[in-house]
Amino acid sequence: MSIQIQGVSKQYGTFQALTDIHLDIPKGELVALLGPSGSGKTTLLRIIAGLEEADGGSISFDGEDLTDIHVKNRQVGFVFQHYALFKHMNVFENVAFGLKVRKKSLRPSAEAIEEKVTELLKLVKMDGFAKRYPAQLSGGQRQRIALARALAVEPKILLLDEPFGALDAKVRKELRRWLRKLHDEFQITSVFVTHDQEEALDVADRIVVMNEGCIEQMGTPEEVYENPASPFVYDFLGNVNLFHGRVHKGKLNVGSVELEAPEHKHVSNVDGIAYVRPHDLSISHTKQSIDAIPAKVSYSHAVGNIVYVELKRDGTDEYLEAEITKEQFKQLNIQAGDFVYVQPKEVKVFIPEDFVI
C-alpha cells in the first residue's frame, strides 16, 4: 500500500512541529525518517498512524483520503521504542492479542490464531519462547516480539518509532539487518523513525532527512550521503571538515590553496565553505598537488582497522580530522608534531545564505 502525504502541518502552541510536508511513499518501500530531536519525524509518523491530527493537509493510503479516519480503521501496525509489551501476558498471548480483541465476526478461530502466532514466532526467530514472559527476555528479544505482534494483524503499513533506540550497539546492528531481511520477505510498506545516521543508511530504501519541521532532502542512502542538498544534510550524515574561503569563478580560495568548485563557476568573489568528509582527506609527507593543504599532526588513535588523525592547519587555529587505514598509517609512519600535507579528494562547496556555521 502506498502513502501520500500532502501539505501536512502541525503546531503545538507556538511551536511549529511540521510545515507543509509533501511526501509520496511507494508500495513496499522501507523509508527512514531521519533527523535530530525536534525535527518533526515522530510527529509525522504519528500523523500517518492516526495517533495525532494534522492542522492542515491530508494523509492518503493508495489514493484514499484517511485524514479523518480513526487509527483503529487504518490497518497500521505500530512498533514503539520501548516495546510496550503486556507484562502479565506471555509471549504467545502478547503476539495473539490483536487477533483476540477483534470483533467476534472478524476474529479468527483459536486454531487459526495458534497457527498464525506460531508462524510469526518462527519468522522472528523466537519459536520456543511462547511461554516466557517479557521480564524473562532480553531487549532485542522483546523488540522482536513487539514486531511479531504488530505483524499478527496483517497491517497494510508498518510504522516503527526508533525501534532499536533502547538497545546496545551490537544488538541494534544485528536487529536492523534482520529487519531489512524481514522487510524483503514481507514487502510491506514500512516507515521508521531514527536519529541514527548509520541505521538509516544501512536499512532504508529511501531516506527522508528532516530538520525543524521541514524535509531537507529525500533520496536513496547513496544519494543523500554522496550528494547532500544542504550543509545541514552534509553535517548531519557524518563528520565533516570545513574550509572557509572565497569563491570566485569555480574555485574556492582557502589561504594560499585553491579548491575546485565547478558548480559555482558563475560566482564572483563571495564567501564559501568547502565540506570534506574525514575519509576523503589523504595525507602525504610531500606536496602532491596544488590543492594540498599544509598541516601538523596533533593526535591519532585507532578504532579497529581505522586510524583517526587530528591535524592543525598551518598558520590557522583550525583543526581537521582524517580517516585512514592502519596499513596507510604504518606506511606514512607519522606521529604528533610531524608536518604533512592533506589533500581533499571529494569536495562540496556551499555559499552561506540562510545558514550559520
Curated annotation (Swiss-Prot):
It comes from the Bacteria. It is found in: Cell membrane. Residues 3-237 form the ABC transporter domain. ATP binds at G35, P36, S37, G38, S39, G40, K41, T42. Keywords: ATP-binding, Cell membrane, Membrane, Nucleotide-binding, Sulfate transport, Translocase, Transport. One of its GO terms (cellular component) is ATP-binding cassette (ABC) transporter complex. GO terms for molecular function: ABC-type sulfate transporter activity; ABC-type thiosulfate transporter activity; ATP binding; ATP hydrolysis activity. Belongs to the ABC transporter superfamily. Sulfate/tungstate importer (TC 3.A.1.6) family. NCBIfam families: 3a0106s01 (TIGR00968). The complex is composed of two ATP-binding proteins (CysA), two transmembrane proteins (CysT and CysW) and a solute-binding protein (CysP). This is Sulfate/thiosulfate import ATP-binding protein CysA. It comes from Bacillus cereus (strain ATCC 14579 / DSM 31 / CCUG 7414 / JCM 2152 / NBRC 15305 / NCIMB 9373 / NCTC 2599 / NRRL B-3711). The gene is cysA.
